[in-house]
């Protein structure tokens, strides 16, 4: 299965310079957060496959006005063609606001869905905005990863 993963930056290749059919090769599109509503709606309109997303730390507006044609999978396991995808958006808390979590809060989110994880017999893909701690995270607390993701992936 060919999956397109997008996050943070709107790729001009798929938007400003779009040519009809450019998204036809993908069977699934995963959006990892911090993408504008209009961009997600454009992708969903042009693609002939599901567009699943989680929110990033700059996506407060998507809580009240979600992008049409897309499926938010926050705290859910979405199954597509036998592939189980868990969505856990947000970043490490660095200020007050929505879609930001401490390590403890993210652990609690995982704990709240532990029955679902057991019932579905695990997951195949973890869709997040933040990385796991130490895996492609960056300096600065806003780009820090979550250690609890390792527990989840075991």
Residues of each region from the PLM?
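Short, intrinsically disordered, charge-balanced linker/junction segments flanking boundaries
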Residues: 150-154
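N-terminal active-site segment of His-dependent metallophosphoesterases
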Residues: 1-46, 118-122
């Amino acid at each position: 299965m060919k999956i397109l993963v997008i996050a943070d930056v709107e790729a001009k290749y798929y938007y400003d310079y779009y040519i009809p059919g450019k998204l036809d090769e993908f069977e699934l599109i995963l959006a990892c957060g911090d993408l504008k509503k209009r961009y997600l709606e454009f992708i969903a309109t042009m693609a002939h496959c599901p567009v699943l997303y989680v929110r990033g730390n700059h996506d407060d507006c998507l809580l009240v006005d979600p992008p049409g044609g897309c499926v938010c999978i926050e705290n859910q396991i979405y199954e597509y063609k036998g592939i189980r995808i868990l969505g856990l958006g947000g970043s490490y808390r660095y200020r007050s606001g929505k879609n930001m979590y401490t390590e403890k809060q993210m652990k609690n989110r995982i704990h709240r869905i532990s029955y679902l994880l057991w019932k579905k017999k695990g997951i195949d893909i973890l869709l997040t905005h933040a990385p796991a701690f130490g895996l492609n995270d960056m300096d600065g607390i806003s780009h820090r990863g979550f250690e609890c993701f390792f527990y989840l992936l075991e």
